[in-house]
Amino acid sequence: LHNLLEIRQHRKPGESRGLFSRVKRVSAGHDDATPASDHVPVEEAATYAGSFVQAANQAVEGHGWNGPTLFEVSIEFECLGRMPEATLDELRTVRRIGSKPVRCIEGPGFHQARLAIALAGRSGFLNLLELDEFSARCEELAASLELTIISPALDPSEVIRLARQAEERLLAIDGQVQFSLVTDRPPSISAIEQAAQHAGLLAWGEGRFFKQQPGSDDIVFSVLPGDQGALLGFLMDLPRVEEPVMAWFSMVEAAKTIQQSLGGQLVDERNTVLSDQAFDHIARQIEDRVRVFVEAGLLPGGDLAKRIFT
């Protein structure tokens, strides 16, 4: 939860606090600030997003040996014969260097493996200290596990150049979708809790709730105490959510359920009341953003995306 809030604080002054702000500016030409689009009922969301989600799930997200290189740099190992599982387990113990996630990728033929470190993340781009530590750790593992490093030596200046580029790419595609519930009178804490429970949310404590991904510990969206006079804020962290369009409709449905229980209106950051057409327009913008992710070799909610966007 802390990470979700930190991103807005780390953005430069004047920058959008999330994807939603950028979306709303697209509709500025309409008198009522509501995008002109045909309403797609929430019940049809599966049809609306299903075809693209299926295609996106087929994208290469770095699970194979020939994964994306835009956001990671790696060191490859080779051993004589089949690489023992104990050796792979030892390589997998390297999960983070500094603030950057590291993952182990098994190679073809069962005699190769790779340790890949993220070039950038929400904490910034890979720095020289992290790169030096990563290289030293790989050399130590190669010596202790009797492995041969077969990849070329990393050029620090080139890696830093790639890391800066990776950070720029991540900043360009990163985004959160958010809106608020405003009411004339604040309801009781128990009323809020009952409304959230009725909407299928789990309590996080201190007036915070979340929707959990079925069958996993992943969070679909969060509901937080509102700011700037709002009662509640609804927040979806797009890069970390599987099937973001479906997650968006799920968050909208939960918000409407809570609104029916507590009253009030659902508004954007500028306190503009959101219509069904606005919600559907945003869904299409989210779908466009997912395409950008896939083109970059990432899949929202996938292993690599969740490692990078933390």
Language model regions located:
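Short amphipathic alpha-helices in soluble, non-transmembrane regions
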Residues: 131-139, 192-195, 250-255
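Membrane-proximal, solvent-exposed terminal domains/tails of membrane-associated proteins
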Residues: 152, 163-178, 182-185, 195-310
